[in-house]
Amino acid sequence: MKQGRYPYQSWRQQWTEKDEEIVLSALKATGTEHLQDRPVDELSGGQRQRAWIAMTLAQDTDIILLDEPTTYLDLTHQIDVLDLLFELNQQQKRTIIMVLHDINLACRYADHIITVRDRGVYRQGKPEEIMTTDLVSHVFDLDCQMTADPIFGTPLCIPYGKGRKI
């Protein structure tokens, strides 16, 4: 996790007490204190994602960019990672920009969604304002029913699947 502080090191200034404090704070925020001495390749998928997020937090930036942070994770770990990112956004006021291909998780966790088609922005805005059956059909080439999530009230995509139209 200490590698997240690498951009702040130079030949004149090596590891400082401030670096140590920032790394410990990142470990605590991600619940990975007990993993700090283990090689990343020995961690489970969920632990590995948390370790990468801790490393990102250790960079101490206002904006965090993530590309598919839930890839290869089972549903429980996907929710754990997204809950963690949500908490970081709420508690530390960090801007988090991420790529997610799961429409339902994007709608549940995002304040703002940007949909992309043909290498350009197709539509953007609050999930409740832009996520429609027409958008999903055009952007993802998927027939679906959009409804409100019964628990969170966010848009929920129920795909029909190819050849299974109602």
Regions found by a protein language model. Name each.
Residues Q13-Q14, P39-L43, Q47:
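Conserved ABC ATPase signature
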Residues Q78-K93:
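Helical segment within the ABC ATPase nucleotide-binding domain
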Residues T133, V139-I166:
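ABC ATPase nucleotide-binding domains
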Residues D60:
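Conserved catalytic motifs of ABC-family nucleotide-binding domains
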Residues I64-E68:
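Catalytic Walker B motif of ABC-type/P-loop ATPase nucleotide-binding domains
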Residues I113-K126:
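H-loop (His-switch) and adjacent beta-strand-loop-beta switch element
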